[in-house]
Amino acid sequence: MTDKQTLKLKLDRLEEILSGYGQMLVALSGGVDSVFLTSFAYRLWGDDRIAALTASGPHFAPDEIEYARGFCEKLGISHKVQDVSFIMPVIEDNPTDRCYHCKKAIFSELVQRAQMVGSVLADGTNLSDMDDYRPGHRALEELGIASPLKEAGLTKPEIRQALHMIAEEDSAIASAFMITTPSGDTMPIWEKP
């Protein structure tokens, strides 16, 4: 089986997984994984069944928050920014399990928002993330956060490839990438680290 065939099977599986959700609220960081998940769902549903929520605080990059906001605005996807500055005391002592506590606090807040609107809360965790030590994943599992990219078996390189394909096939998504990319930045999001 070729790499393209494998990717197609995984994308078909992702579509099947997402079809099981009534509505989905994506925890949109502005990074490649959550942008891909948002783009893929948008292609399936338009803006009817998807919304995005971005956490903000002193420990988040303002340019990624602005990218997420601009991306959603361009596509007409409902987008909210949730301030999570309150978590700073949880992590200011820099404990060894700070990633767990940080994710738990942030996603506990996001889960409440998702429950208020009756949506599944999904994040951009993918199969490649399982290769690293990431204590924050335990918090996601405890909170029941959906990780459809991981469930579909998609790796980071496959996500980059699929995002590039989507941009080539869908002019609205390609336009959203271009409009929200800072001037002078010529690197497409699927190539960013």
Regions found by a protein language model. Name each.
Residues 1-165:
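ATP-dependent adenylation/nucleotidyltransferase module used to activate substrates
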